[in-house]
Amino acid sequence: MAGYLRVVRSLCRASGSRPAWAPAALTAPTSQEQPRRHYADKRIKVAKPVVEMDGDEMTRIIWQFIKEKLILPHVDIQLKYFDLGLPNRDQTDDQVTIDSALATQKYSVAVKCATITPDEARVEEFKLKKMWKSPNGTIRNILGGTVFREPIICKNIPRLVPGWTKPITIGRHAHGDQYKATDFVADRAGTFKMVFTPKDGSGVKEWEVYNFPAGGVGMGMYNTDESISGFAHSCFQYAIQKKWPLYMSTKNTILKAYDGRFKDIFQEIFDKHYKTDFDKNKIWYEHRLIDDMVAQVLKSSGGFVWACKNYDGDVQSDILAQGFGSLGLMTSVLVCPDGKTIEAEAAHGTVTRHYREHQKGRPTSTNPIASIFAWTRGLEHRGKLDGNQDLIRFAQMLEKVCVETVESGAMTKDLAGCIHGLSNVKLNEHFLNTTDFLDTIKSNLDRALGRQ
């Protein structure tokens, strides 16, 4: 979120009252099914539900507009609603987050608004019972799976890497390695050893890591065959869905056993389960060394899926986001190993600084596109699972309308800043405020659907 907020740090300061479409407060109904409104009869019928996870702050307000103005007037769908706003997570002792993940397991598709992960300041601000864990982490721990980030490309938004003319999707194995490691400071000379004690009672194995002649640091880390296998299945499934080649990067020349295990598991699963489908789609899987892969990515035009270990994915996903231009144009989809269950959301946070301006009654210029794409990616997947071609076409049409709207020159301040520089842009000359931009997308969508 910090990167996104830096991009959009300069807000529209024009005076004005709260936009008419914006809810007056953060609170919302917590029931799983919200009251049905009266919409046109010619909506696309959707047979099975989608789980909706509401969120916090500015993204929550935009989320409501997207649902009421862009989705529900055209799609007749049952939404299993869960309020993951921080006040309700606190009120339910975070049970609502667990319930939303279990519902996603049941219905296979979820769309999620950005949420606050509380720190000490948020605990004080919201008078929370405790510092609740990241809802994304809780959901991921229940569902498993891999988070794939993919940029939304608009031709008129400059890229730091101009050659990236097609998207690059990065899949991060968000389990183990450095993030679950045990590290320590050795404050004197001594021997650092690793010991493995098998549960079956067989012989203990011991490795001497280093003999410290003086102070230093040490670390032990791990991963599991089960987690690596789930990661591999998610990556292969996603590549087949996108019809893009898949690259997996490690440093197995140095970590021969550790990274070599990643390489071997991926290859075994590919050969056994996915090679036929890859050949059928004329795509390929390839393992590469991480340093070679980074160089190849910079030279490439895009159009592939990149599977990264935990640390590599953490670093490289931020590089990709900046290289493509903006976190406001980055989607995030959690894909489970079954290839059927997904949860889609925006890659950015709740846009707190804009929400503070909104609370003062001032208009903002907040980019809603990644939140719109959370809805479209979820609906498109629902359509694929159900064989609902009308729903798939609608989701693709809404995405196309968003991109074409930006390419026509109508955009929010963060995107205008990418083109002209934030210090040079002016309201209604280079960018629109939030409500006007959303209204423009709505008008363009209505026009596009009317042409069908």
Curated annotation (Swiss-Prot):
Principal cellular location given in the protein's record: mitochondrion
Modified sites of kind N6-succinyllysine: K80, K106, K166, K180, K193, K256, K282, K384
GO cellular component: cytosol; extracellular exosome; mitochondrial matrix; mitochondrion; peroxisome
Origin: domain of life: Eukaryota
EC numbers for this chain: 1.1.1.42
EC main group: oxidoreductase
Transit sequence range: 1-39
N6-acetyllysine PTM positions: 45, 48, 67, 69, 80, 106, 155, 166, 180, 193, 199, 256, 263, 272, 275, 280, 282, 384, 400, 413, 442
Binding annotation for D-threo-isocitrate: T117, S134, P135, N136, G137, T138, I139, R140, R149, R172
Details of cofactor binding: Binds 1 Mg(2+) or Mn(2+) ion per subunit.
Entry keywords, A to Z: Acetylation, Disease variant, Glyoxylate bypass, Magnesium, Manganese, Metal-binding, Mitochondrion, NADP, Oxidoreductase, Transit peptide, Tricarboxylic acid cycle
GO BP annotation list: 2-oxoglutarate metabolic process; carbohydrate metabolic process; glyoxylate cycle; isocitrate metabolic process; NADP biosynthetic process; NADP metabolic process; negative regulation of glial cell migration; negative regulation of glial cell proliferation
GO molecular function: isocitrate dehydrogenase (NADP+) activity; magnesium ion binding; NAD binding
Cofactor: Mg(2+); Mn(2+)
Effect of mutating R172M: In GLM; somatic mutation; reduces enzymatic activity
Record family assignment: Belongs to the isocitrate and isopropylmalate dehydrogenases family.
Disease: D-2-hydroxyglutaric aciduria 2: A neurometabolic disorder causing developmental delay, epilepsy, hypotonia, and dysmorphic features. Both a mild and a severe phenotype exist. The severe phenotype is homogeneous and is characterized by early infantile-onset epileptic encephalopathy and cardiomyopathy. The mild phenotype has a more variable clinical presentation. Diagnosis is based on the presence of an excess of D-2-hydroxyglutaric acid in the urine.
Protein function: Plays a role in intermediary metabolism and energy production. It may tightly associate or interact with the pyruvate dehydrogenase complex.
Name of the featured protein: Isocitrate dehydrogenase [NADP], mitochondrial
Species of origin: Homo sapiens (Human)
